[in-house]
């Protein structure tokens, strides 16, 4: 089997045929974890044996055991390797997202297990995207997302959560990568912290004529502001992305709580930034989990 991540289209039939056993899934995960060969984290020796019944590697020098999933978001999970692989494939290959109820039915696990799997996958998406910063031309703005609230005197209701959004784009206005962050407020210092974490210094930031944005980003970015008008073609990529994000949250997940909103934003950003990969997204997600 090729040592590369999957490059061509992989159908459900292809996936079933390629990963029809624990051994094949184990081989796939090991290639992801050790693309240049195993190296013991304890003694540095490159030879090991396998304890397949427990998905462990045993160093032939120091005899220490290393779990295939150690250091990953699935560490200490009781899932089989096939379940992990199926979960990644099903989650990655539905561009609308996948709810815990859907995954529960497809994997034939209980709801709590399905929910745990999706939380782990979203965490892997977040960790992978934290490696990268937006640069070049970046559209920046904020939005409000309705989130469910519980425990109020009148029962369940909704409140608006503040979200800062930034979308990088090319010179011909094609959007590339995106960042979204739930924010406690929309003050200048908050925009400044968001930019420091997510936007490379020296980038050209395009936004509306918001005083907090001007003050928060004035020192380290080339700024371009316009007073917002619905007739103008300004921040179109960003507003389209916001609309798509809200459609995913309402359509697939039927709303989320404020406590978990960031997890769903992380999922959306990972998908959006890799939307051109199509079914190759499975390989990208697997790499995010195991690399």
Predicted regions and their residues:
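Residue-level recognition of single "structural anchor" positions
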Residues: 1-291
């Amino acid at each position: 089997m090729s040592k590369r991540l999957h490059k061509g289209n992989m159908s459900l039939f292809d996936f079933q045929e390629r990963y029809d056993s624990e051994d094949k899934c184990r081989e796939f995960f090991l290639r992801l974890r050790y693309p240049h060969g195993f190296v013991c984290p304890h003694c540095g020796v490159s030879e090991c044996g396998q304890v397949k019944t427990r998905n462990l590697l045993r160093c032939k020098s120091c005899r220490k055991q290393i779990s295939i999933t150690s250091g990953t978001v699935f560490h200490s999970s009781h899932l089989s390797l096939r379940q992990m692989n199926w979960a990644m494939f099903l989650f990655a290959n539905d561009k609308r997202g996948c709810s815990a109820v859907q995954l529960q039915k497809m994997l034939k696990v209980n709801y709590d297990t399905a929910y745990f799997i999706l939380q782990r996958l979203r965490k892997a998406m977040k960790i992978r995207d934290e490696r990268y910063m937006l640069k070049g031309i970046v559209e920046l703005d904020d939005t409000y997302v309705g989130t469910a609230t519980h425990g109020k005197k009148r029962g369940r209701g909704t409140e608006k959560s503040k979200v800062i959004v930034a979308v990088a784009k090319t010179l011909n206005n094609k959007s590339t990568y995106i960042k979204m962050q739930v924010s406690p407020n929309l003050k200048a210092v908050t925009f400044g912290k968001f930019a420091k974490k997510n936007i490379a210094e020296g980038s050209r930031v395009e936004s509306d004529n918001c005083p907090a944005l001007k003050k928060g980003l004035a020192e380290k970015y080339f700024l371009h502001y316009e007073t917002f008008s619905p007739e103008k073609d300004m921040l179109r990529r960003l507003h389209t992305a916001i609309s798509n994000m809200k459609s995913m949250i309402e359509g697939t997940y039927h709303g989320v709580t404020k406590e978990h909103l960031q997890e769903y934003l992380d999922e959306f950003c990972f998908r959006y930034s890799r939307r051109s990969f199509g079914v190759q997204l499975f390989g990208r997600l697997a790499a995010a989990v195991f690399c």
